[in-house]
Amino acid sequence: MQAYNTQTGIVCPLDRSNVDTDQIIPKQFLKSIKRTGFGVNLFDDWRYLDEGFPGQDNSKRPINPDFVLNKPRYQGATILLARDNFGCGSSREHAPWALSEYGFRTVIAPSFADIFYNNCFKNGMLPIVLTEAQVDDLFEQCLANEGYELTADLERQVVVTPDGTEYPFEVDEFRKHCLLNGLDDIGLTLQQSEAIKAYEAKMQQNTPWIFKEVRA
């Protein structure tokens, strides 16, 4: 997993509350368990004017010019600014996969659904909770200034605006450690590889019958 320390990027404002995971990545695209291939269908129902289905050539689909992701001023955005209860609905991990593959590494909102919030950390993304008033201010600034950028500093736990205003945010120390060091569940397990090997060797010595090959 890619480590996360500090990110500065263009902000894309998604001014909708209660965005659920089926809106983030619709259910018809969930047939794969690979983490890739979902970015082109992020917010598919809003992003395109036709009905999406797996395997189609998205470059030939009619886009919705009114949807925020399709506006030229937000192309290349890496920070998503959202409203309350972002990521609600079903617990599909495909939602952070789609956001990440599109290019978002940071999502800022007044609140998140718990499972989505946890899944972000497991996939190298930083979900930041700010107050509703702070998020309102960021929406106002973003809409008023084309190319508006923010800096998310995980080490210092602050969001920094272009004028130097800092908004502090809370993050669990363990999750912070994992993001800063690029550790997902597999990475954390591999850190204990020597202890695992020692345990297996001890088990083979104490209970050798468990490790015998079973023949039909």
Swiss-Prot record:
It holds the Pfam family Aconitase_C. It comes from the Bacteria. InterPro entries: 3-IsopropMal_deHydase_ssu, Aconitase/3IPM_dehydase_swvl, AconitaseA/IPMdHydase_ssu_swvl, IPMI_Swivel, LeuD. Heterodimer of LeuC and LeuD. Pathway: Amino-acid biosynthesis; L-leucine biosynthesis; L-leucine from 3-methyl-2-oxobutanoate: step 2/4. It comes from Psychrobacter sp. (strain PRwf-1). It catalyses: (2R,3S)-3-isopropylmalate = (2S)-2-isopropylmalate. This is 3-isopropylmalate dehydratase small subunit. One of its GO terms (biological process) is L-leucine biosynthetic process. CDD domains: IPMI_Swivel. Catalyzes the isomerization between 2-isopropylmalate and 3-isopropylmalate, via the formation of 2-isopropylmaleate. One of its GO terms (cellular component) is 3-isopropylmalate dehydratase complex. NCBIfam families: leuD, PRK01641.1. The lineage of its organism: Bacteria, Pseudomonadati, Pseudomonadota, Gammaproteobacteria, Moraxellales. Keywords: Amino-acid biosynthesis, Branched-chain amino acid biosynthesis, Leucine biosynthesis, Lyase. Its EC number is 4.2.1.33. GO terms for molecular function: 3-isopropylmalate dehydratase activity. Belongs to the LeuD family. LeuD type 1 subfamily. The keyword Amino-acid biosynthesis applies.
